[in-house]
Regions:
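Short acidic/polar alpha-helix capping motifs at helix-coil junctions
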Residues: 11-15, 63-66, 81, 91-95
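Conserved beta-strand residues within beta-sheet cores
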Residues: 26-29, 42, 95-99, 113-115, ...
């Protein structure tokens, strides 16, 4: 993809997250993009991300859904305000609630494809629905409630 990922717009002090921080050399460094009204993310688990041979660890799945969904919440908030990502003041979101439904075991060996849509934007809250598929088969669904980071959480 030629465009910048949502996470590449985060200011430095918001770029250290294990799941999505571009400055976390040990992290997952997921990347999320718009595809029309949905956001997309493709992530290939490493062999050590296994629960048992042949299947992806559920905690990793929750982490990827979490970070992709909060990035989507931020991108949607910028869109709702008619702003370009990366403009000041920065809009960054954290997880208030995460519900994950594991529909089928998630196989290793192929990228995880995440597709998210916005269900609601209300004040500081954004509700994001995410579907995770492997090779076209939906394996996991998630619903995340994200809230805008208060200024008190920002280390400057």
């Amino acid at each position: 993809m030629g465009e910048k990922a949502f996470q590449e717009y985060y200011p430095e002090h918001f770029s250290h997250c294990y799941g999505c921080g571009v400055l976390n050399e040990h992290g997952l460094r997921i990347k999320s993009y718009w595809d029309g009204a949905e956001s997309v993310c493709s992530f290939r688990p490493m062999p050590y991300h296994t629960s048992f041979p042949g299947f992806v660890y559920g905690g990793l799945i929750a982490s990827v859904i979490d970070c992709h969904s909060t990035a989507t919440a931020a991108a949607a908030a910028y869109r709702a305000e008619g702003r370009t990502m990366g403009t000041e003041p920065p809009l960054r979101y954290v997880t208030a609630s995460l519900k994950v439904d594991y529909l089928h075991p998630t196989p290793m060996g192929s990228p995880l494809e995440l597709r998210s849509s916005i269900r609601e934007i209300k004040g500081r809250k954004v509700v994001v629905e995410t579907r995770l598929s492997v090779d076209g088969k939906e394996c996991v669904r998630g619903e995340l409630v994200a809230v805008r980071i208060p200024d008190t959480m920002v280390a400057r």
